[in-house]
Amino acid sequence: MGLKRFKPTSPARRQMIIPDFSEITKKEPEKSLIAPLKKTGGRNSYGRVTVRFRGGGHKRKYRIIDFKRDKVGIPAKVVSIEYDPNRTARIALLVYADGEKRYILAPQDLNVGDMVMNGPDAEIKPGNALPLENIPVGTVIHNVEYIPGKGGQIARSAGTSCQLMAKEGKYALLRMPSGELRKVPVKCYATIGVVGNEDHKNEVDGKAGRVRWKGRKPHVRGVAMNPVDHPHGGGEGRGKGHHPQSPWGQLAKGYKTRRGKKASDKLIVRRRNG
């Protein structure tokens, strides 16, 4: 995995930094593991915009990813590392000993030809999935479950990981990517290693068109709107006139928006902001 720069033949080319895709296997995606993906343009079933600045973009097919890693005790071989347009990480195609094929998130240091395993008896090496109770303290992990059997939800983006800090009774203590310390049941599965494509954070689109290809539309500032459209709208010049707010009047920039009482509060040992 590396990044590619270009000769400055245009202002966009001068700025652009994109992956070189050297780790990608040259093959079509596995047909049995892709599904149609319908575009919404940020609209809900009523046709109303629920997410602003979405629309257009290149057509995609969804890759069905195995986040549960519930095929226990059967070894699998990595036959390809592939690009997935729906996420920042790369994905790895596994072929199990019984012939079944599944996609997983490709961690760092997982290569074509490697063998991986799921289950309590799996070796501690990148790509293997085990319950937290079977993972040594201090291990770096990703694709961690919140609820046993639900499938991994924590640390799935490119370059992210958690660290197993301690185990006590029914819970394991994790340091989350945000720095938060959180308890998770020890029966939850996690995958060893750091999610691959760690250079994703250094990519630069270089031009507006590349962002449009991803389905993102221009993000209009509130101060550029009329008073009817945004709390920052109107007035002479660019002044807000009051505290920064969202389009719906929610205070921004430092105002805490998390709901007061949640069942998971008792599982958070230390918040990410102290």
Swiss-Prot record:
Cellular component GO terms, alphabetical: large ribosomal subunit
Keyword annotations from UniProtKB, A to Z: Ribonucleoprotein, Ribosomal protein, RNA-binding, rRNA-binding
Annotated region described as Disordered, given as residue ranges: 222-274
InterPro entries: NA-bd_OB-fold, Rib_uL2_dom2, Ribosomal_uL2, Ribosomal_uL2_bac/org-type, Ribosomal_uL2_C, Ribosomal_uL2_CS, Ribosomal_uL2_dom3, Ribosomal_uL2_RNA-bd_dom
Membership in a protein family: Belongs to the universal ribosomal protein uL2 family.
Function of the molecule: One of the primary rRNA binding proteins. Required for association of the 30S and 50S subunits to form the 70S ribosome, for tRNA binding and peptide bond formation. It has been suggested to have peptidyltransferase activity; this is somewhat controversial. Makes several contacts with the 16S rRNA in the 70S ribosome.
Record's subunit section: Part of the 50S ribosomal subunit. Forms a bridge to the 30S subunit in the 70S ribosome.
Name listed for the protein in its UniProt record: Large ribosomal subunit protein uL2
Name of encoding gene: rplB
